Amino acid sequence: MPRKKGAAWEEPSSGNGTARAGPRRRGGPAGRKRERPERCSSSSGGGSSGDEDGPELDGAPGGGKRTARPATAGKAAGAAAIITEPEHTKERVKLEGSKCKGQLLIFGATNWDLIGRKEVPKQQAAYRNLGQNLWGPHRYGCLSGVRVRTVVSGSCAAHSLLITTEGKLWSWGRNEKGQLGHGDTKRVEAPRLIEALSHEAIVLAACGRNHTLALTDTGSVFAFGENKMGQLGLGNQTDAVPSPAQIMYNGQPITKMACGAEFSMLMDCKGNLYSFGCPEYGQLGHNSDGKFIARAQRIEYDCELVPRRVAIFIEKTKDGQILPVPNVVVRDVACGANHTLVLDSQKRVFSWGFGGYGRLGHAEQKDEMVPRLVKLFDFPGRGATQIYAGYTCSFAVSEVGGLFFWGATNTSRESTMYPKAVQDLCGWRIRSLACGKSSIIVAADESTISWGPSPTFGELGYGDHKPKSSTAAQEVKTLDGIFSEQVAMGYSHSLVIARDESEAEKEKLQRLPEYTPRTL
C-alpha cells in the first residue's frame, strides 16, 4: 500500500460551529459567536484583520459593505427579484441519480442533540441518553432490504439523508428546526421516509447546519428546516419550516446544489450559479458581506431571501490587479461552513467567502466577496475534476488524479495557505471524499481511508479497542473486503454506501453488527 501519512488538524469547538444567538431581523446583530477570531499564524501569506471587503469592482452587484440603512423587518417576499425563465425557453430535463447501489453503514456519534455541544439543550433533555458512539461500521436494522444510491450529510450537520434506488428521500438525526422534513421538530433516531416528498423522484440532496435542500428529477428544489437567514430561498425569514416547500425560483432547471452552515448554492443546467441565505463573509459571491448598521448601533445582515445569480468571477495578478474572468460555466459547487468552491467547464477552481486558515487557497487569509480563481488549477494539465469543502478546509482532485488540500482541519496547527498535494494518497484513485468538523473519509480503489485528530467519536471507523484518532491517513480495517461506493460525513459521524452485488459482499456485510437505536 502506498504511503499514507498525515495532515493538519483542528480542535473541536465547544459550541456547534458558529452558533448564532437570539432572534434578529434580516441577519441579526453581531453579538453572536463569530468565525473572525480564527485568523492565525500560517505557513505562508499574511493574515487580515478586521472586516475585509474583497475586491471593489465597477458595476459589481452589491458594491461592498453597507454602512447604514433603515432597520426594517426583512425583505418582503415580493421585494426580491425572483429568477424567472419564459416557459418556451426553459430546458426540459430528466435528471438521473447516482448509479451507486448498496447498503447503508454508519459509524460515529449518534446522540444527535449532543453533537458539537457541551450538553444537550434543556428542551431536548428527554433525549439526553439516547444514541451512542459507534466506533466501527454498523448496519441499520430498519433498513433491511432497502437499497441506497446516495447518502448525504454536511460538515456542520447533525442530521443525515439517504436516497433509495427508487428515488425516495429518507432522513434522521437532529430536528430542532424541522430539517428532517417530517412536519414536526421531533428528533428521529433511525432513517425514516419523508412522506411529503414520497410522490417525487429525488436525485440529490444537501444538508446545512439546520436546513435541507432536495432536488427532483425535473430540476425543482424543495427546502425545509431553519430559515432565519433566508437560507431556504422561500422569500421570507422564519424560525423553522418543518415541511418541504418549493423554493421561489422559476428559472432553468437546477442540476446541482450545496449547503453551507446558513446559506445555499444552486447550479442550473446552463452552468449559472445562484446563492441565498447569510452573506456575512461574502460567501454568497455578490461582492458584499451584507452588513449594515441598524438602530442602536446594532450590526445586522441583509440576507438574500431568494436565489440570486452570482454574476462576477475574478482573478488577481501577482501585482494585485483584479481582472474579470469571462464565460465561466459552472460544473460543480461545494460549500464549507462559511466558504464556497466552484469547478467550471475549463477545470478551473474558484473560491470565496471566509478566508481564515487559508481555506480559500489564495495564500492569504482575506475574505473574498466574489469568486476568485485559485491559480494552481489554471494551467494546462493541472485542472481539477472534483472539489470538496470541509468545515475550514478544501480539497480538489486534479485531472491526473492527485489530491490537493488547503486550509486547516486542526486549527491549533499550522495552516496550509494554498493547494498542496496530499502525498499520503498519491497513486490512489479517489472516488468519493467527505469532511466532518475535523475528520476526513475517502473511498479510493478497493479501500476506505480516514484520518482525524483527537477527540473523535467513532467517525473514523477504526473499531472498538483500537486507537480512536489518527493524524495520518489509515485504511479502515473494519471495512476490509467491503467496497465503498460513496462516503458522506456529518459533524462527527460517517455514512458509507457498501456495495452488495455478490454473495461474498452480502455475506461480509451480514457479519457487521446491526444498530437498532433506542427510542422514547
UniProtKB/Swiss-Prot annotation:
Residue ranges with Basic residues bias: 22-34
Classification via PROSITE patterns: RCC1_2, RCC1_3
Region annotated Disordered, chain positions: 1-78
Protein localization: Nucleus, Nucleolus; Nucleus; Cytoplasm, Cytoskeleton; Chromosome, Centromere
Modified residues (Phosphoserine): 14, 41-44, 48-49
Span list, region Required for interaction with RAC1: 316-323
Keywords: Acetylation, Cell cycle, Cell division, Cell membrane, Centromere, Chromosome, Cytoplasm, Cytoskeleton, Guanine-nucleotide releasing factor, Membrane, Microtubule, Mitosis, Nucleus, Phosphoprotein, Repeat
Residues found modified as Phosphothreonine: 18, 340
Comp. bias regions, Low complexity: 69-78
Membrane topology, as annotated: Peripheral membrane protein
GO annotation terms (biological process): activation of GTPase activity; cell division; chromosome passenger complex localization to kinetochore; establishment of protein localization; focal adhesion assembly; integrin-mediated signaling pathway; negative regulation of focal adhesion assembly; negative regulation of GTPase activity
Database matches in InterPro entries: RCC1/BLIP-II, RCC2, Reg_chr_condens
A GO molecular-function annotation: guanyl-nucleotide exchange factor activity
Primary location class: nucleus
Cellular component, GO annotation: chromosome, centromeric core domain; early endosome membrane; microtubule; midbody; mitotic spindle midzone; nucleolus; nucleus; plasma membrane
Induction (free text): Induced by TP53/p53 in response to oxidative stress and DNA damage.
Positions of post-translational N6-acetyllysine modification: 90, 122, 291, 375
Pfam families for the chain: WD40_RLD
Intervals holding RCC1 repeats: 101-163, 166-217, 219-269, 271-345, 346-399, 401-445, 446-499
Summary of the function given for this chain in its UniProt record: Multifunctional protein that may affect its functions by regulating the activity of small GTPases, such as RAC1 and RALA. Required for normal progress through the cell cycle, both during interphase and during mitosis. Required for the presence of normal levels of MAD2L1, AURKB and BIRC5 on inner centromeres during mitosis, and for normal attachment of kinetochores to mitotic spindles. Required for normal organization of the microtubule cytoskeleton in interphase cells. Functions as a guanine nucleotide exchange factor (GEF) for RALA.
Subunit structure: Interacts with RAC1. Interacts with nucleotide-free and with GDP and GTP-bound forms of RAC1, with a slight preference for GDP-bound RAC1. Binds preferentially to the nucleotide-free form of RAC1. Interacts with CORO1C. Interacts with microtubules.
Name of the protein this chain belongs to: Protein RCC2
Source species: Mus musculus
